Amino acid sequence: QGLPLIDDNIYLRVKYHFNKKAAYAFAARFYLYYTQPDFSNCQKVINYANIVLGNNASQYLRDWAALGALSPNKNIQPNAYVDADNRANLLVISAASYWPLVSDPGYANCERYCMNNITASESCKSEGPWGDQSSYHQIPFSPGGSIKNGFRRLVIYQQFTSGNSWIGYMLYPAFTTDEALLCRAEAYTLLKRYDEAAADIDAWQKAFTKNTQTLTKETINDFYARLKYYTPEAPTVKK
């Protein structure tokens, strides 16, 4: 009942406040997690995601090709990822945090907080119906000779207090159009509306990867039918 009361016109910079599209994206996420035995929650996920994405979701997804073309240093890609002017970012929040420092694979402190070669092989470096990691527009970053892997998406901002002492801050896109699309795809899947789910996954993979093959429920089923189940010695995404 509170969603229609949100007024974007009262904000100077809408993306830094709980705006209307962010609220509907939150509702889509909430109802996806609030699973009912009969999956009656899923239609609400679809309805709220539709408000966020409109009739053509692809035009609102992140431009992953543009992001991947930027330098993967500690600032350029992460700053572009959290940019409030990016069409995919619906709500950008700030926090006093050192998380970008400990989670980025380029920092020495992150060994316990980012992917290693084994966990990366079943996540950011895994193979999907769109191909392997070489098909991604944004390639997972790994320092030379290191087992650390991950995407560079967060940057630490420093507020110096005195001398060399400083407080760390971060910006984080709490809700994005890409997530809203994937929430809708999962809701379609739970409702056994597989063609619509595959269409959403296809829209996402064409934004995130270089693959131009259209994904269908048949091609997705064929890929995962051939994939071996996970074992500790040979991890995969199929559990």
Roles of regions detected by a PLM:
Residues Q1-C183, L190-D200:
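Structured, solvent-exposed acidic/aromatic patches
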Residues D38, Q213, Y230-A234:
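Intrinsic-disorder-associated interaction segments
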Residues R87, R193, K217, K238-K239:
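Surface-exposed charge patches in extracellular/virion surface proteins
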Residues S165, I201, L215, K238-K239:
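Helical anchoring/docking segments at protein termini
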Residues E196-N211, E218-D222:
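Active/binding-pocket-proximal capping segment
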